[in-house]
Amino acid sequence: MAASVKPTRRYESPRRREQAAATRAAILEAAQGLFESQGYAVTTMSAIAHAAGVSLKTVYVVFETKSGVLRALWHLLLRGDDADVPVDQRTWYHQVLAEPDPERQLRLNARNSRIVKQRAAALMRVIRDAAPSDADLAALWARIQSDFHANQREIVASLHERGALTPGLDVERGADVLWALNHPDLWHLLVGQRGWSPEDYERWFGDTACSQLLVTPHSGER
């Protein structure tokens, strides 16, 4: 009987992994600048490669498509790092759900919203604007909206379980309210167009969420 041949294991040195990570980061940084300054449709893979200082082939090898670049960039900005951990498994999200005080819970949610939007709000508009003409991005935008609503619903459900929701407000309507207050379009209107500071937005979001959702808003953290 012929001896079985074990497949050769591919060895990647730490240095090579570091170089690959640096190349990926350079491409994403270049793509972010181009997408946010001139939009998705105008930005080409060649332009991304040139801005990143890499070959066009490298961009295709790493991300395959332009929508793949945008999708990877979105996940990076949403999560704040390259770790493949969904939002609903992030420590900061679980801290919101675990917060026992209803008002502090909503204000912590507002703070996290401000932090994420400072990183990712501009790219959200790029994705939204490109979605009608690109099936991949249409699916990404739909998923963003769905996940966003589901996360806010989970927060409202936790308030409902503790009897903290204002009378007459059920979980579904409360989730819609919190989702609307937390929507990136409102950030764009208030911060982008009206010139509110991110801190003003966070305070308004927290105040409004408490007044709309909670049975008895407290003094809270101002």
Which sequence ranges carry the predicted segments?
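N-terminal intrinsically disordered/low-complexity leader segments
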Residues: 1-22, 217-222
